[in-house]
Amino acid sequence: MRESEIVLDFAIQVRRALELQGFQVVQTRQGNENPSFDDRSATANAQRGAVFVTLHISSTGLPGTARVYVNSDLLPVANSNGLIPWDRAQAPFLGLSRTFGDLVQGFLTQRFKGSPDAAQTASVRQLRTTAAPAIAVEISSVTVEDRAELDRMAPGVADAIGRGAAAFKPSYIVPNTPGALP
């Protein structure tokens, strides 16, 4: 089994679930091309009011479970010019990422017994350079003998991400009011 093919299949379903919730989706990877992490982050960071979700199929963990990771704490860096270093773009969003991650993890736990109750922290390369609430969703496990076991998880994972994003939106997106400055 190729992890990249399975992830793309999951991504299609996640996209549909998010669109059903009314979200516009921009994918940073659409096929077997392999954009760099920096290119993916640049695409994500160009969006306004966005959240970032990266999907992975792990080779570890209890098969049939799913985990959400948020970036570990990033120590603040004081730059005299006021700019945030690229590899610390996530720092201002850590609290929002935790909230988003916990919501998605709660929905995953309802679907996949044995999954953790809350998002976990890890140093995830792709999240560090993302200037938006960002989570990594990891599905276990690529080591299953029958790919159909993973394929059966895709709708539940997609639904959990869609529902989590919808639940998170009010805490992140402030609606515009007529006459107010954006």
Residue ranges and their predicted role:
Residues 1-182:
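Active-site-proximal helix/loop segments of hydrolytic enzymes
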